[in-house]
A protein has these predicted regions:
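Non-heme Fe(II)/2-oxoglutarate
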Residues: 82-148, 174-177, 209-211, 217, ...
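Double-stranded beta-helix
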Residues: 205-275
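Conserved double-stranded beta-helix
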Residues: 126-137, 148-218
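Fe(II)/2-oxoglutarate
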Residues: 1-87
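A generic secondary-structure signal for well-formed alpha-helical elements
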Residues: 116-120, 157, 203, 273, ...
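Catalytic core of Fe(II)/2-oxoglutarate
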Residues: 245-315
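Short hydrophobic-aromatic micro-motifs
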Residues: 95-96, 195-197, 269-271
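Short, solvent-exposed loop/turn segments at secondary-structure junctions
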Residues: 100-102, 169-170, 202-204, 216-217, ...
Length: 315
């Protein structure tokens, strides 16, 4: 059979695809101008094209305990949220129990079942991710714009947020530790935020979510740290496993402590763009772990995908 050619590594194919979807890149045109990035919006983009690799988010530059009590809107949040806002700079996450009620979680589950049965939503071939249901379902899209939630996320980033994607899981992800910012990246760094929603109870056997408190304070691990071989026409030669190995080494080096989120249906976990997290191995393959992740970008920043060097398409 010989060696198979990986055509996805060729950037010119990305450029053609981006040109076809040019309207979905309009969000970056104003941001490129704002940050003086002189580059076509259809072109490949990575951290190499920016002048720095530092987060500019206000709660990364300063400490939440000192800053958030003085910000307009802080007093409007419930006490359970205010307490966790104060520790955001230390922890990099917020847990809200029973945030979504039975009506909301059943709505999401029903919509996913409907889309799968109608063959409008298909799991990725190498995992069980169901991508972008928010683009296919008005009820799910409405949930991504939940006003209480977007108000909180906008407060955390000090910028208006916009939902980029949803990922639905039927089973546990079995995903190794990673930071979302290798997949969905911003310039300046720090302007992505994620919300994980438990659509059923989790337990030690169905592959619960894990995370490393405080890991968001580590330097961002970007292509230049592991993805050697990028050229003008091709992306780097290393694969995603190399990135995961670097994260694993970093966890050992820094002696990070793992926390496991044994969530109940309706609970949510909000995490920082750079918080290291993943999914524990599924001990019982017969069990489901239904959940949905929503990734949000801040509205007025450059949005792209570091690992593939492609600009984000917002539809």
């Amino acid at each position: 059979m010989g060696n198979r050619i990986n055509i996805k590594k060729y950037k010119f194919l990305h450029w053609i695809y981006n040109l076809i979807h040019y309207k979905s890149l309009s969000h970056n045109k104003a941001a490129y101008k704002k940050y003086a990035i002189h580059r076509p919006v259809i072109a490949s983009i990575s951290s190499r094209n920016f002048p720095d690799k530092e987060s500019k988010a206000w709660l990364d530059k300063g400490h939440s305990r000192e800053l958030v009590p003085h910000k307009a809107g802080f007093s409007h949040f419930p006490d359970t949220i205010r307490r966790q806002l104060l520790t955001w700079s230390d922890n990099g996450y917020i847990i809200l129990e029973s945030y979504f009620d039975e009506t909301a979680t059943s709505c999401i589950l029903g919509e996913i079942e409907r889309l799968v049965n109608r063959h409008k939503l298909h799991p990725a071939p190498d995992n069980n991710k169901l991508m972008f249901a928010n683009r296919l379902s008005a009820p799910i899209r409405e949930i991504t714009y939940d006003q209480r939630l977007t108000d909180l996320l906008s407060f955390l980033l000090d910028k208006e947020v916009v939902p980029f994607q949803t990922i639905n899981f039927v089973h546990g992800s079995n995903q190794r530790a990673h930071s979302d910012s290798i997949h969905m990246t911003t310039y300046p760094l720090g302007y992505l935020i994620a919300v994980w929603i438990a659509l059923e109870d989790t337990n030690p056997d169905n592959g619960p979510l894990f995370y490393y408190p405080g890991s968001h304070r580590l330097p961002y691990l970007l292509n230049s740290d592991f993805n050697e071989g990028t050229t003008l026409l091709t992306v780097g030669k290393k694969n995603y496993g190399d990135y995961e190995d670097r994260i694993a080494a970093l966890i050992r080096e820094k002696e990070l402590k793992k926390e496991v989120f044994l969530a109940k249906k309706g609970d949510i976990l909000i995490w920082h763009a750079n918080l290291i997290h993943g999914g524990l191995p599924v001990r019982d393959p017969g069990l489901t772990r239904k959940s949905m992740v929503i990734h949000y970008y801040a509205k007025d920043v450059i949005k792209y995908h570091e690992i593939t060097e492609r600009p984000s398409l917002l539809k």
